[in-house]
């Protein structure tokens, strides 16, 4: 194998760099809009280090320096140091739990003099490197249980440590890594299980306070979830178990049993028919375990565990809600429509909607947003900065920014796909694309009321050095890896 030197100036993807610089520039201008005050600040004050805009400008300058340094590091060092970097950040995340001060109920910030750093933002690139290194290792296979266990552990360990820091929003970002695994050949069954879990949670928690009119003792959420579990189980038996007849028996048996229980409760003796549904789910799992013993077909065992796990997950949903911070509980309950609190936790979302709606088609103009200038929207320069864009630039401006993000993410995916046999860079590229997509969807979703407010920043726009540096590091490493895509040839 011959190796040729890389001409970074010619090999680097300049289009991606231009898109990055455009996003960072628009982000800084949005922070100017969100923090500018007609009565107190002048245009020159925006450049002062005493203001958020001046500080953000300093973070941007430091980000450029970090990018230049990382672009000078050869690919072989990223591959060689992937695991050490990952384990180092795992240690830092663990230490942060104990040494970080309590800031708004979270122990996720390390304070060094006047500077506050959030390790969770930097652990994303460490996890991306480790995942890319593992999946590109010779002999790695999605069919090996040990490899799957290692793969899941790399994602779950930092995620759990961040949860222990009471930073649930940042921890949820790590779920985006499973999209990368799906691209690399992971079976779609895990994604299907994830979708089922979301449905169980939304329906179970969202309808937990409602009861059937004809049977007041039957909880609507519990009834629907216990109806879905055997149906999803039957669907999996038909798809993965390759036994359509067994799938029809499972679905038909559960529906018939539930219907008979409803008739008995409605016209004979009233009782909670969810008890019968629970028994039917247990019988379904036992039947699948019996078929596994009889035929030694592993899919039956896994589907039986899915059925039992679904029941356990449903009952654990309320326990999970109880473990969250009170303000996080209220945000989820408001999002699911269980409670209405327009002057409390729902205040941010309501004011954000008002700000975006008041922008109309073309917006009120740069620095002319009244909702933002009068500070109606809390955290308008950080998590809710998108409402500033909506108010001042209108629907057209919001659409332009979203299209810019879409183009940027698609470009990153293109960089990942053009790597050929270079699996390390491809996996890393998809890690970055998945993280960006998750941040974009959740942040914009929570600003317009479609997602819970969980404190996830908008990449390159939200105020703060940790987020900007974290994404700059992620992108800089990808650009260097991509620049070396043709440096090795046989």
Region spans (language model):
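Short, Lys/Arg-rich, polar N-terminal cytosolic tail immediately upstream
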Residues: 1-9
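Pore-lining and gate-forming transmembrane alpha-helices of multi-pass membrane transport proteins
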Residues: 387, 398, 430-431, 459, ...
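Transmembrane helix boundary and interhelical junction motifs in multipass membrane proteins
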Residues: 167-172, 364-369, 380-382, 448, ...
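Hydrophobic alpha-helical transmembrane segments of multi-pass inner membrane proteins, especially
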Residues: 21, 25, 37, 43-343, ...
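TM-adjacent membrane-interface loops and short helices in multi-pass inner/ER membrane proteins
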Residues: 331-385, 393-398
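Transmembrane alpha-helices of multi-pass inner-membrane enzymes
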Residues: 231-234, 449-486, 490
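Short beta-strands and strand-coil junctions in structured, solvent-facing domains, enriched
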Residues: 31, 289, 362-363
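Helix-boundary and loop/linker segments of multi-pass membrane transporters
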Residues: 8-10, 147-148, 374-377, 420-421
């Amino acid at each position: 194998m011959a190796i040729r030197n890389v001409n970074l100036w010619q090999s680097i993807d300049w289009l991606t760099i231009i898109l990055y610089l455009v996003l960072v520039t628009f982000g800084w201008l949005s922070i100017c809009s969100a923090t500018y005050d007609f009565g107190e600040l002048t245009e020159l004050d925006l450049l002062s280090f005493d203001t958020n805009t001046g500080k953000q400008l300093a973070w941007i300058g430091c980000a450029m320096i970090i990018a230049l340094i990382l672009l000078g590091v050869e690919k072989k060092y990223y591959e060689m140091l992937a695991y050490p970097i990952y384990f180092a950040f795992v240690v830092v995340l663990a230490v942060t739990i104990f040494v970080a001060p309590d800031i708004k109920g979270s122990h996720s910030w390390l304070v060094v003099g006047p500077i506050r750093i959030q390790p969770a933002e930097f652990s994303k690139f460490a996890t991306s490197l480790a995942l890319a290194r593992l999946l590109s290792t010779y002999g790695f296979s999605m069919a090996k249980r040990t490899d799957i266990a290692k793969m899941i552990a790399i994602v779950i360990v930092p995620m759990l440590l961040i949860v222990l820091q009471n930073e649930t929003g940042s921890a949820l970002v790590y779920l985006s890594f499973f999209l990368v695994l799906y691209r690399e050949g992971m079976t779609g069954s895990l994604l299907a299980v994830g979708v089922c879990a979301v449905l169980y949670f939304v329906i179970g928690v969202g309808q937990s306070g409602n009861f059937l009119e004809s049977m007041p003792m039957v909880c609507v959420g519990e009834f629907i979830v216990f109806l879905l579990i055997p149906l999803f189980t039957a669907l999996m038996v038909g798809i993965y178990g390759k036994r359509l007849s067994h799938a029809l028996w499972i679905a038909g048996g559960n529906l018939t049993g539930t219907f008979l229980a409803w008739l008995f409760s409605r016209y004979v003796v009233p009782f909670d028919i969810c008890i019968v549904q629970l028994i039917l789910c247990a019988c379904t799992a036992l039947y699948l375990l019996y078929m596994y013993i009889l035929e030694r077909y592993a899919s039956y065992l896994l589907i039986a565990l899915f059925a039992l796990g679904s029941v356990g997950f449903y009952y654990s949903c309320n326990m999970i809600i109880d473990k969250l911070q009170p303000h996080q509980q209220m945000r989820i309950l408001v999002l699911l429509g269980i409670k209405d609190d327009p002057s409390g936790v729902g205040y941010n979302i309501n004011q954000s909607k008002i700000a975006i709606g008041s922008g109309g088609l073309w917006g009120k103009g740069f620095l002319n947003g009244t909702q933002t200038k009068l500070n109606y929207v809390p955290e308008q320069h950080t998590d809710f900065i998108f409402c500033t864009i909506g108010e001042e630039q209108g629907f057209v401006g919001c659409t332009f920014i979203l299209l810019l993000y879409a183009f940027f993410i698609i470009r990153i995916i293109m960089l990942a796909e053009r790597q050929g046999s270079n699996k390390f860079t491809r996996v890393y590229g998809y890690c970055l694309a998945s993280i960006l997509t998750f941040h974009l969807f959740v942040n914009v979703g929570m600003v317009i009321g479609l997602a819970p407010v969980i404190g996830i920043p908008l990449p390159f726009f939200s105020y703060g050095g940790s987020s900007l540096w974290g994404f700059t590091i992620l992108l800089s490493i990808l650009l260097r890896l991509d620049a070396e895509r043709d440096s090795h040839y046989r």
